[in-house]
Amino acid sequence: EGPYIRRDGETNPANFIAHRKSMIRLSELIGTLVSAYLLTGEEKYARPAVRHLRAWFVEDDTKMRPSLLYGQAIKGKYTGRSIGIIDTLHLVEVARGAKLLKDSPSFITVDQQAVRAWFSEYLNWINTHEYGLKEKVHPNNHGVCWSLQAAAFADLTGNEEIIDWIRAQFKSVYLPVMMDEQGGFPAELKRTKPYGYSLFMIDVMAGVAQIVSTKDEDLWQFVTPNGSEMKKGM
């Protein structure tokens, strides 16, 4: 009955993951349905996507609260932790889908506004609550995952200030500090699953680069003074 002990790379087999599984399922559904809509232009794919968006972010009886106070709790020790914010990484796909669905007649204006308002509120929470502020500057993949989420949510809601911060963080911290001259990630290579964590890290960094790059500031082509760049990481 005592508090659980943290062991890197291991999870508690009795932990509650139903909500996380639901979020993963949502990201898969939105990604698939919105892709089908964009390829075919058929509303039969947009309509169910909108139903899921309404259930999660609009309807008072079913929508998720725009906060993560109880993420990655540890029995007997913590009711929630800052690193739990990484679990909403699956909402990146959802935010991207909501943006791409904007021209669908099925996604009426009032619903679009409600979805954007939800993501704006959650973005504000991860950028002001102590959990979010700690995760924002976390020195490994958690910090980059914060930025990927914030980038997707800011892109959907039009928050250029956040996007500018992430772009600067990518150029001043993620590449020159988290990546070495050979394209490796020292903090991830020290862990129990170095290969998997390294692949995850470059995947998340690629997502950040894709969202916040501009014609004038292409993070895919950016090279640090010490020679770190996305090409080496890939």
What are these regions (language model features)?
Residues E1-E135, K171, L175, M179, ...:
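Extracellular glycan-targeting catalytic surfaces
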Residues E1-F16, H138-A152, L156-G158:
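Contiguous N-terminal and early-domain "leader" segments and peripheral loops that mark the onset or edge
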Residues I24, E28-G31, K44, R51, ...:
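Short, well-structured alpha-helical interface segments that form or flank functional binding sites
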Residues S82, I86, H90, D111-W118, ...:
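Short, contiguous, pocket-lining structural segments
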Residues L148, A152-M234:
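Long, repeat-rich segments with strong aromatic
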